[in-house]
């Protein structure tokens, strides 16, 4: 039972009554009806790759839940060539959906490092983002239909995928990002995209976050002027401490001629000739044209979570700020963390293109939240969000007020009460 009750960070976890692994929507409905009748909490769980405690029970307080594992609901339907859509079981992994789409001549718009363990249901429940948000948007932008079981065991099925359907509330959009607090997502209908063409990937050293943003802006201009029809697909950022850590843990060498405070990863759809990159002789960069070399460059970014996990218990702060304020906020966060003795190791990496920073802190005990709160309060001062793509979970439930007004929180609580009047769906997540 251990894999179901402790999350990836090793910071969150607690007891449960049982772990059940239903194989159908009907079985899930029966479980929810039984739990509702007995007043027992329910915790839906996908691949348990969450980083904010939303996919595991609380350590203490309240009645232990029944964990509903979705890992048997793995069916992926045939790709509808006419609409460019497919219906996917909640337990299928992101990687399985990606490969299924590619075999049919399509691609799915969401991608992230945990693709082979994160489930589709989990990515929908958290409205996952990943590396291609600038091109395709968050998970919510991919979802065109949903099937879910509500707290009382009733089943809602809306999987037609019609793009024009204004008959009432958009329940798919509501359940996307709800973190298991409104119901159990069992299947989704998602839109697919045609392949974009050959890409070029580059790691580029810059002196600051301001320079990183300027470089990203120039990449967009270069794509438009040098390679008509091309586009910026991804823009990632990795600071020097994070680069050093991943090099040490993953046995990678520093990829550039010089050391830089910030390294930017750009992926551009440009026919694979590098014409979409803003490069000249003054830039310290390494460029990859074939897929093997591109995967090697992506490893510096995608193995960051592994690197910080090897360093100890990680406090992971997934935040976002408006792009015009990102550089100032990042600089202030680095200066702030340098003053905190408990923050023995820290760094920033993330999705530059959409203002999403992953602030990683190793050193504080699992329940020592002083550094966490300092980071979240700093982000709030810049008008940012305390959760960019990982969800609120248990980790940030008490901090929701930092970026949501009292009126907004009251409205969300009202929705929660309407769909889950007994408060049995993932209690303690999203709201404290």
Kindly give the residue locations of the regions a language model identified.
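N-terminal flexible segment immediately upstream of the FAD-binding catalytic core
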Residues: 1-33, 50-84, 113, 242-253, ...
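N-terminal accessory segments
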Residues: 1-8, 15, 38-40, 281-294, ...
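Feature of Fe-S/electron-transfer and energy-metabolism proteins
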Residues: 2-4, 20-21, 26, 34-37, ...
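Conserved, mostly hydrophobic/aromatic
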Residues: 35, 180, 420
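Residue-level signal for inorganic ion chemistry
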Residues: 35, 48, 91, 153, ...
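FAD-binding subdomain of flavoenzyme oxidoreductases
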Residues: 75-82, 86-231, 236, 424-426
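Activity-critical C-terminal alpha-helical subdomain
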Residues: 154, 397-432
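C-terminal substrate-recognition/cap domain of FAD-linked oxidoreductases
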Residues: 190-193, 200-206, 213-374, 378, ...
């Amino acid at each position: 039972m251990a894999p179901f009750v402790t999350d990836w960070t090793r910071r969150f976890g607690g007891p449960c009554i049982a772990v059940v692994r239903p194989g159908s929507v009907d079985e899930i409905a029966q479980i929810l009806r039984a739990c509702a009748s007995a007043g027992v909490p329910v915790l839906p769980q996908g691949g348990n790759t969450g980083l904010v405690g939303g996919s595991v029970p609380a350590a203490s307080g309240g009645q232990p839940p029944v964990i509903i594992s979705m890992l048997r609901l793995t069916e992926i339907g045939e790709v509808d060539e006419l609409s460019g859509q497919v219906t996917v079981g909640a337990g299928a992994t992101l990687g399985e959906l990606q490969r299924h789409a590619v075999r049919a001549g399509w691609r799915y718009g969401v991608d992230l490092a945990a693709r082979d363990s994160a489930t589709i249901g989990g990515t929908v429940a958290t409205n996952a983002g990943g590396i291609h948000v600038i091109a395709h948007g968050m998970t919510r932008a991919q979802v065109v239909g949903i099937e879910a079981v509500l707290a009382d065991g009733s089943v809602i099925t809306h999987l037609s995928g019609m793009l024009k359907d204004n008959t009432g509330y958009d329940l798919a959009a509501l359940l996307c990002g709800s973190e298991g607090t409104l119901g159990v997502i069992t299947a989704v209908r998602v839109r697919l995209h045609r392949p974009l063409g050959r890409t070029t990937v580059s790691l580029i050293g810059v002196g600051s976050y301001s320079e990183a943003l300027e470089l990203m802006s120039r990449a967009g201009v270069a794509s438009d002027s040098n390679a008509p029809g091309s586009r910026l697909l991804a823009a990632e950022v990795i600071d020097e401490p994070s680069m050093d850590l991943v090099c040490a843990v993953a046995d990678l060498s520093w990829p550039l001629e010089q050391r830089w405070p910030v390294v930017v990863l750009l992926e551009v759809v440009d026919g694979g000739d590098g014409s979409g990159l803003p490069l000249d002789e003054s830039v310290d960069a390494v460029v990859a044209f074939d897929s093997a070399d591109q995967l090697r460059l992506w490893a510096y970014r995608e193995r960051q979570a592994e690197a910080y996990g090897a360093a100890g218990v990680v406090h992971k702060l997934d935040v976002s700020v408006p792009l015009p304020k990102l550089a100032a906020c990042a600089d202030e966060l680095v200066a702030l963390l340098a003053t905190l003795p408990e923050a023995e190791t820290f760094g920033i990496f993330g999705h530059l293109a959409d203002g999403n920073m992953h602030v990683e802190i190793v050193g504080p005990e699992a329940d020592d939240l002083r550094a966490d709160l300092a980071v979240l309060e700093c982000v709030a001062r810049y008008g940012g969000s305390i959760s960019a793509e990982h969800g609120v979970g248990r980790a940030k439930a008490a901090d929701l007020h930092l970026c949501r007004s009292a009126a907004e929180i009251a409205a969300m609580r009202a929705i929660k009460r309407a769909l889950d009047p007994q408060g049995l769906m993932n209690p303690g997540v999203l709201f404290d």
